Amino acid sequence: MDPFNFADSLLVVLAQRLVRRLCTQCRVIEPMSAQELTEILDDYTHAWPKDDARFDREQLRVDWLTRFGREGQMVKYHTPGCIHCNQTGQKGRAGLHELMTVTRELRRLIQTGARAEELQRQALIDGMRTLRQDGIEKVLAGITSMEEVRATSNV
């Protein structure tokens, strides 16, 4: 298909993966160390364009603290296992989603045959959240584990 017609007809692109959900019956909350927070921030911001001031790592940390923190501190979750989850620590599934809305600028890049890296950069600037980023937010919310997110999403 020619790039012009393809770009003109494309509205959105959706990717999704399923991850195992943490058992809510045995889920335990612990304080997150500064090192763990730094590693998660590194993982989350890995795909961000390096030369764009709109992507502020410190603002992201503050936002996470507001949305996911407990008593002014970031927390992490672990599940030792219980009778409700058959001692696995996991029960059910949750979806990770990546939705790329085709904006005017993305359409132009597709029509001119831009490389995948350029398309991803523009999609991130336009507000797309990657599978990994959606997964990390679900880790911070206590829905799934970082191991699950890493196993099902690429960097």
Language model features: what each stretch is:
Residues 1-155:
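Short, flexible helix-loop junctions that flank or precede catalytic/ligand sites
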